[in-house]
UniProtKB/Swiss-Prot annotation:
Gene null: resulting phenotype: Leads to increased sensitivity to oxidative stress and iron-starvation, reduced conidial germination as well as reduced virulence. Impairs the production of the 6 siderophores beauverichelin A, dimerumic acid (DA), Na-dimethyl coprogen (NADC), fusarinine A, fusarinine C (FsC), rhodotorulic acid (RA) and tenellin; but increases the production of mevalonolactone and eleutherazine B.
Amino-acid positions noted as binding ATP in the UniProt annotation, renumbered to this chain: 439, 454, 553
Gene: SIDI
Keyword line: ATP-binding, Ligase, Nucleotide-binding, Peroxisome, Virulence
Name of this chain's protein: Acyl-CoA ligase sidI
Pathway this chain belongs to: Siderophore biosynthesis
Protein's UniProt keywords contain ATP-binding: yes
Function field: Acyl-CoA ligase; part of the gene cluster that mediates the biosynthesis of at least 11 siderophores, including beauverichelin A, dimerumic acid (DA), Na-dimethyl coprogen (NADC), eleutherazine B, ferricrocin (FC), fusarinine A, fusarinine C (FsC), metachelin A, mevalonolactone, rhodotorulic acid (RA) and tenellin. This cocktail of siderophores for iron metabolism is essential for virulence, and more specifically for the fungal virulence in penetrating through the host cuticle. Siderophore synthesis is also involved in conidial germination under iron-deficient conditions.
Class of this enzyme: ligase
Species this protein is from: Beauveria bassiana (strain ARSEF 2860)
Amino acid sequence: MTPVTTKTIRPEVPPETEKLSLLHGPIDPPLVDLTLGELLELQTYQHGTHECLVIPWTGARWTYNDLNQQSSWLAHALLDLGIGVGDRVGIMAGNCEQYAAVFFAAAKIGAILVILNNTYTPTEAMYGIQFSECKVVFTTRKIGRMDNTRLLGDLDNLDRGPKVVMLRGESANYATYDDLIESAMGKSHEKLYEAMRRVSPHQVVNLQFTSGTTGLPKAAMLTHHNLVNNSRFIGDRMRLTSADVLCCPPPLFHCFGLVLGLLAIVTHGGKIVYPAEVFDIAATLRAISDENCTAVHGVPAMFDSLFQAEFPANFRCDRLRTGIIAGAPVPRYLMELLVEKFGMTEFTSSYGLTEASPTCFNAFTDDSIDTRLTTVGTLMPHAHAKIVDRDGNIVPVGVRGELCIGGYQLQAGYWNNSAKTAEVMVRDATGVLWLHTGDEAVFDEHGYCSITGRFKDIIIRGGENIYPLEIEERLLAHPAISRAIVVGLKSNHYGEVVGAFLERAPTAAKKPSDQELRDWVRKRLGGHKSPAHLFWLGEGGVPADVPLTGSGKVKKFEMAKLGDELLRKETPVAKL
């Protein structure tokens, strides 16, 4: 697979008077040219006896020396299995110490780690394994409550399938992680060092399947250079040091858990704690307290669950100061709770996407609370960003449009999918490569970015653009609403009208009427933004569960399809 190459040309800066939405990130600190293997060796030299990785649910407490040694033994074993530069190694597992070892082991020998989402069905996992042609797959018989038996059976039935290695637990006739480690212990590392010398920072090291809200997942090709530098800059924005302890509930199969979590900590010599195999409220709260964490990451739904739970006896979070909340739009009340309940006065908002390795914008810890509540911060070092209209023209500052990203951090393309790569990665007239994110955003005059929705989620009602996020935020401000999902529904007259799927708050004494909610929206927003159709989750033929991508984003196209179907069946719903 030939990666897309990027030019280092600096996009042409427009005249000052134009005030166009074009930004360039700081040029300091400089980019570094390190492989992930070199990064771990360097940090081990500096912080060898310092704890790096804590997994309360397995009891593991690995120092930098431990992680480096385990990954080196495993890398040696992979070489003995014939795995080399460019070969694909798959992993489907929960958060555990072995996951980190597999990641660095593959990186050390130039292999490409194919990360498989734990929420995949056996069919989806098989697609990822076969599409990327994995030679080895690391997994477990169970991941949380999920049983992997069917997937293992499907792999066994392949004529020329990958070698399956069990990370832990019952192994039956499969090779195990411990077997591979033991096979390499005591052997000379010369073979490994020779392999490491053949690895370049600009080689692909990771395939991340994007959990897009439409179509089959695509595999973003990320390089050592992408990940090492992006994780450095993330940690810098959080002011991480070797004294920090990060509690990281997000999964390692996602960039949030891997890059914003593990790698941001490793680049700064700190310690990371993965509380449980899969997200567990009680385990996360215990980890924050027991490990004296200074930071905690999470998507909004995770933090919401933590704040709704009863804190354990003697719970302490007096050292908590920072962390990142990202992955989905963040309600204001949730950010306020980070400060009020956790004391995270230095929390940071963030924006990124898999194809950009991932973080593009991140707030500083000393940005005002209001700035962190309303924006995703400013552009990261060595990145470029612009906002364009539907014709590809850069819009003035303050005008919404599609966010595009350029710079060192862009993916090398989608694995074996040149058509999709060409669709989202487009060179401008000066030859600069831009990634079209599909996200709608706006810049202010100081370079702060606000994400206002999905560019393709815009509802066009009678020729007027309507932005779902502002309607969702208004509906969520109603005391009887705990969840709001706004989509465009088909209309013969307007083309599209506003539809809203709502969840009633547990504390609500009664369900508000449709008219009450329409009036509620109209008080702050225009009448054309008031929902024409209202549906309640779990009622009137509407499922209680919302379809989500693997990273927790709502599949809005499925919700819109459901709404259209309900209307076609003439389900009794109030109409405007």
